[in-house]
């Protein structure tokens, strides 16, 4: 959680943070979602290969992206549980060391002892489909990258969709770390209607630049001090597990340096955008009644031809939101078109 008034150095700090990540991680190791309601702060990073999405400047799209991050967090925890890993680093190490043997162990059925054929894919844009069957119905897995979500101005998001944004941020902050998903939230208006108690309680790591008043400092740090900082990168930092702030000075990164860094990174490869992240389930719900989805017949035809079924498979091919695709799968199961979920195995298609 980062706060600072205009000119205090907050934006320079965010740029320094992003550049440090670009120096340390390849796109296979780290993917980012940058939310920039002010349109100008993160423009320099457009089209770098680390991005999951083009820089998000629409608060409604940011709300949908945060909901996706919650679903991805839950999906990753299911994968970590199957493989017996406590965190993402342990998971990636197991995949690297054991390869296909890991998949074979995971896909052995406890009931029948039968093994499913498996394939291991390298890290990259296919990581979003880990444990999903490919076109041939073969489950696959690969290394999972870290995901960092950076929000430049929280106030704009809270004005548009306060409840959804607050819940998503709280859920990601309180349990996504072990799944490799991290969140940086910044604001220049640290009032209690923007930085709510729920958000603050779940973001224990705080950075405060110069603030206008004691009240603002109390909101961010739970103590005074930020109102007496000097500006231009002078900050107080409270790490997780500590109640005492440390006084630091942020690194200065100018526009020319950012331009050189991003130009080099862009020369190494193009981004693989996953625009299905922004498919809005609420918009889908406005278009149809739950018992009469106009794309249901198309989805049935798709899974019959493929011979396997999953919500992610329908989402990718029909370009619908995840929740809508999941409802179609549940409807198919209730009608006897597909079988029940069976751990890592793809659902069996009963209708031929």
PLM regions: where:
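P-loop NTPase catalytic phosphate-binding loop
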Residues: 1-122, 129, 137-211, 215-229, ...
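Conserved alpha/beta core segments of nucleic-acid transaction machinery
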Residues: 136-138, 239-352
């Amino acid at each position: 959680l980062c706060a600072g008034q205009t000119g205090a150095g907050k934006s320079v700090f965010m740029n320094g943070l992003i550049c440090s990540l670009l120096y340390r991680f390849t796109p296979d190791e780290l993917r980012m979602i940058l939310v920039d309601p002010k349109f100008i702060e993160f423009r320099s990073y457009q089209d770098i290969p680390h991005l999951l999405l083009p820089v998000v400047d629409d608060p409604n799209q940011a709300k949908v992206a945060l909901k996706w991050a919650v679903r991805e967090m839950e999906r990753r925890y299911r994968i970590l549980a199957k493989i017996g890993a406590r965190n993402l680093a342990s998971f990636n190490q197991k995949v690297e060391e054991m390869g296909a043997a890991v998949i074979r162990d995971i896909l052995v059925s406890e009931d029948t002892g039968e093994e499913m054929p498996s394939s291991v894919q390298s890290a990259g844009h296919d990581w979003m489909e880990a444990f999903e069957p490919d076109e041939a119905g073969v489950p696959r897995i690969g290394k999972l990258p870290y995901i960092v979500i950076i929000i430049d101005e929280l106030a704009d998001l809270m004005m548009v969709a306060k409840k959804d944004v607050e819940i998503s941020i709280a859920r990601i902050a309180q349990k996504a770390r072990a799944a490799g998903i991290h969140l940086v939230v910044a604001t220049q208006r640290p009032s209690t209607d923007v930085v709510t108690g729920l958000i603050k309680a779940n973001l224990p790591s705080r950075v405060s630049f110069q603030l206008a008043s004691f009240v603002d400092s109390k909101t961010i740090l739970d103590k005074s001090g930020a109102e007496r900082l000097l500006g231009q990168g002078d900050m107080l930092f409270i790490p997780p597990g500590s109640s005492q702030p440390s006084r630091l000075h942020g690194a200065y990164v100018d526009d020319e340096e950012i331009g050189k860094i991003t130009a080099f990174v862009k020369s190494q490869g193009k981004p693989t955008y996953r625009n299905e992240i922004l498919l809005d389930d609420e918009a889908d719900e406005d278009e149809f009644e739950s018992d009469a989805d106009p794309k249901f017949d198309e989805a049935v035809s798709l899974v019959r031809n493929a011979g396997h079924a999953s919500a992610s498979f329908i989402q990718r091919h029909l370009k619908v939101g995840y929740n809508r695709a999941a409802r179609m799968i549940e409807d198919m199961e209730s009608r006897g078109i597909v079988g029940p979920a069976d751990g890592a195995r793809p659902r069996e298609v009963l209708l031929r």
